[in-house]
Amino acid sequence: VIQYIIENLQNNTRFSKKMYKYMISDQTITGRQVCMLLWEQDLITVEESKITALKNGSTNAYNFMLDMIKTLQITPAQLALDPCSGSCVVTDVRTGEVRALVSYPGYDINKLANGVDAEYFAKLQADLSVPQWSAATQQETAPGSTFKMVSAVAAMQEGVVSSLSETIFCSGIFDKLDPPSRCWSSAGHGNMNLSNAIANSCNVFFYEVGYRLAQDGTGYNSDYGLSRLEKYADLFGLTEKSGIEITESDPHFSDETIVTSTIGQGSNNYTTVGLSRYLTAVANSGVVYNLSLLDKLTDSKGNLIKDYTPEVRNTIDIDNSIWDAIHTGMRAVVEKKSYYKDLPVNVAGKTGTAQEGRNRTNHALFLSYAPYENPEISVTVRIAYGYSSDYAAQTARDVYKYYYDLAEEDELLTGTADIPDAVSGIQQD
């Protein structure tokens, strides 16, 4: 039995990692030795001067490792610490065609085709960053404030906000229910109309919307409010899969309190591609597509077997002034981002910072489209446990630079993992 255990543990990557953790902790293996092993086994490419500094002690192991992480010699996927996964979906908002669907980390599918590379497959199975799990189509999180456009349409169509000029006062706290709910801005936003509330991501405005939706004639009824809000989530396609031709997780509309559900919390849970379909409908003012990754299927002679042109699921028939107010608010969101100032294409978007638990950091989301004046594409980015929506927004900016030929690919793929000044103050919106 002992021999069997020993043989199995020798091939158990998880056990080995735990063992090394304790060996490093009690200095059986030093941090410097770990760094040297990474270099000697060609896992990192390092300037000779940095290796010399590590060897002679002028650089300690901690600073050496930090430098490797900043310069991306060691990637988030290799660390497998939060955040280590992300996804991006780009759609043509005029047709519903998916232009790009990206999940990070990825893996080499060629090693699993025409005969499986057993060693590589075992490595994938043990990888704590879970590269075989699609962050774009299977990973689900709360949408956070990116859901507020759904709530905005519900507010106007259900008549709980009487006009686009009606204001709701935000003092920083919503205290009509116990316990009270807070806005991300503790100082409050003052009087907010619908467009301002989107631009400033005012939670109190949307808490009040949820509270009003829940009035059933006898008083506050959260379930009644949820049923009213769900109609609009369904209109945007958020109660069904997006239509893409690969494995996708089922969406989940919130069944928890209406007040937090209107700001994209509660138990709302969606994939990145599902949010992309919703965003596409926002960008094109109400056309909801069943998305498609494929163009067409032909035989060896080029004869058409099947056309995969995306179908229209439904249209959202609301007054154009409501769309205009939503789009204006989304444009104002991006206008506040200093790192979008030099982009010659006008972008509109909505940030989202979604809380899942207190023992891990928040998810970072950014839903956007461009050009603002005449939308062509939408870009949806999510970084699970990514701290701030600004990180997702910067990723989207780089996608726009690439799409509109504003930067070379090499320029976008090189750089460091430093925290830019523009996002050093984290806003929980």
Please tell me what each predicted stretch does.
Residues 1-65, 69-72, 76-145, 150-385, ...:
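Beta-lactam-recognizing serine transpeptidase/beta-lactamase-like catalytic domain environment
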Residues 304-306, 311, 397-429:
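Short, gly/Ser/Thr-rich active-site loops of penicillin-recognizing serine hydrolases
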Residues 389-395:
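A short acidic/glycine-rich loop-to-helix N-cap element
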